[in-house]
């Protein structure tokens, strides 16, 4: 209610035109209303009228902070604290300014004052620990968090805030290389930890660090039973149980145990070579094409940098296209959508490999069959853009936009292509 605030301030100033605090607050309000120059002038004038008012200095500090003049803001907060040293709001805000300026030691002092004044607030404990962490003193940060955990009583069940404090404590111990401390803390606070996946991951990493590889493998496998699509967990499990030569064997074993995991099957393609790759890629590609996965090319594009894999993928998709072609009269061909998505993949593939004419042949055939899909016209536009035909690409993107005029993404892309 900025207008009402200005009106009230004007009413006061009509009777006391040199009342510094009112002038400063009016300047702060005007600054918040984007009247920057007038707001800054009035705030400084308010300080000049009443140099001994912490409110005037506080208002000027806020204005400088909003103006991102953090150095001047700190000076104003320091002056306000000389006048009103026990004001917690000013102490808190000055601490934030010290943090903004990367002055970690004064930030620690500010947070320590707040903690001593309000030790019942969890945020003060965590903020002090974070201040020590940012200053590079992780040992002191751990001591602060341990002190907080010692004074906590009657912790309710499923208290996510307390759980996060414990996990932050564990992460600091992990960064310090104290794997035994991580295990002890997680075991002691097990009943209060809500985020079990993060806790289990820390525990598994700690077990690996101290050399208990069998226990670490069991821990990682238990996590894969919970979520077999997490690439980081799969990678960590392989680092524990497999060498570079045996990674494919262990991945195939995981594939048998988690047959629905797409991530495991995708990681197999990265590791497998030659005949093994062809076999696994055929299964992966056919499954994705039958499921009509439009992002298949983006998924497999990273494999093209590995020798021979690009050509094998091309052969597999071409074989699928020929086998599923409805014009062959083969009764065993797949659904029409699979044939179209095979051609859709090949259009991306040939455009990426520089065979523009073949890419256009495939994408034009799909558009002739299904002209109402904006994605097909967008792909045609990308093929033409990659070939350097910017005007034709803009026309193709405009065709895509006209199919759904309310789609902001299509409108933006069409405008971008026209600008190009």
Language-model features: locations:
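Non-TPR docking regions that flank or precede TPR/alpha-solenoid scaffolds in eukaryotic proteins
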Residues: 1-420
């Amino acid at each position: 209610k900025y207008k009402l605030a200005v009106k009230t301030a004007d009413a006061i100033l009509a009777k006391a035109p040199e009342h510094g605090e009112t002038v400063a607050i009016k300047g702060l309000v005007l600054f918040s209303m984007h009247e920057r120059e007038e707001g800054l002038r009035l705030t400084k004038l308010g300080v000049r009228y009443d140099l001994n008012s912490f409110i005037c200095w506080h208002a000027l500090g806020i204005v400088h902070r909003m103006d991102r003049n953090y150095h001047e803001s700190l000076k104003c907060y320091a002056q306000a604290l000389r006048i009103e040293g026990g004001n917690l709001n000013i102490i808190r805000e000055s601490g934030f300014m010290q943090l903004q300026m990367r002055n970690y030691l004064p930030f620690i002092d500010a947070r320590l004052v707040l903690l001593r004044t309000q030790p019942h607030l969890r945020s003060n404990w965590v903020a002090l620990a974070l201040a020590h962490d940012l200053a590079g003193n992780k040992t002191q940060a751990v001591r602060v968090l341990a002190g907080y955990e010692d004074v906590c009583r009657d912790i309710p069940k499923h208290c996510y805030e307390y759980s996060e404090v414990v996990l932050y404590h564990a992460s600091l111990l992990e960064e310090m290389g104290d794997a035994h401390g991580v295990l002890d803390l997680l075991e002691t606070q097990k009943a209060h930890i809500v985020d079990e996946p993060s806790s289990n991951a820390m525990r598994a990493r700690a077990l690996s660090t101290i050399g208990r590889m069998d226990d670490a493998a069991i821990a990682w496998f238990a996590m894969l039973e919970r979520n077999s699509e997490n690439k980081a967990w799969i990678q960590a499990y392989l680092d524990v149980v497999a060498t570079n030569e045996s990674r494919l064997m262990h991945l195939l074993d995981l594939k048998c145990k988690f047959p629905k995991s797409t991530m495991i099957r995708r990681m197999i393609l990265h590791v497998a070579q030659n005949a093994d790759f062809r076999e696994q890629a055929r299964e992966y590609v056919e499954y994705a094409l039958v499921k009509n996965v439009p992002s298949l090319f983006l998924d497999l594009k990273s494999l093209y940098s590995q020798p021979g894999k690009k050509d094998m993928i091309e052969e597999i998709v071409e074989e699928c296209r020929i086998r599923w072609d409805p014009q062959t009269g083969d009764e065993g061909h797949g659904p029409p959508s699979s044939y179209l998505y095979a051609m859709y993949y090949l259009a991306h593939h040939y455009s990426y490999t520089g065979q523009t004419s073949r890419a256009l042949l495939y994408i034009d055939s799909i558009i002739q069959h299904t002209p109402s899909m904006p994605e097909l016209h967008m792909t045609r536009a990308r093929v033409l853009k990659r070939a350097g035909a910017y005007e034709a690409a803009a026309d193709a993107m405009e065709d895509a936009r006209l199919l759904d005029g309310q789609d902001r993404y299509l409108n933006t892309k069409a405008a971008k292509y026209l600008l190009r």
